[in-house]
Amino acid sequence: MAPPVRYCIPGERLCNLEEGSPGSGTYTRHGYIFSSLAGCLMKSSENGALPVVSVVRETESQLLPDVGAIVTCKVSSINSRFAKVHILYVGSMPLKNSFRGTIRKEDVRATEKDKVEIYKSFRPGDIVLAKVISLGDAQSNYLLTTAENELGVVVAHSESGIQMVPISWCEMQCPKTHTKEFRKVARVQPEFLQT
């Protein structure tokens, strides 16, 4: 049976220096070893020496979208000025928690920005490749752009629930009903295609 896991908080006294030597996530003061992190207490000893006392965090640090990063996101809502999205991946790394992002009307494509209509570019539920252009505003939204040929909608479903196929840079078609819908279609690069 495994020994019970002991959790500790920063500043908690773990043991005296006669019982162990300090490891990562700890510091010494007045002959005692203290925790410098919130995490699990670990003791490891080799060859009968004093055990090394360390504190290890449970989870690794959260990956964050950075300016210039290519992200995969899902459209949650749209209006005439922008599309709201949830960022799910940074590059090919999945995020533990999704982040909110916004694709503004003027950031949808590089040309004819004044003619862009959000509802002809994205729909709720679409999976979109986008690039982070700013870390956002007071609502903690990341500002994203799809103003490159390689960025835009990569997966979309028709009203009948069938995954659509891109037929041009601005249209996708349902293979079952053959209805066409407008989207800002991404030209997916070969390295992102799964075989």
Curated annotation (Swiss-Prot):
Keyword Repeat part of the UniProt annotation: no
UniProt-recorded name of the protein: Exosome complex component CSL4
Matches recorded under Gene3D superfamilies: 2.40.50.100, Nucleic acid-binding proteins (2.40.50.140)
One Pfam assignment: EXOSC1
Keyword presence, Ribosomal protein: no
SMART domains recorded: S1
Residue ranges constituting the S1 motif domain according to the UniProt record: 66-147
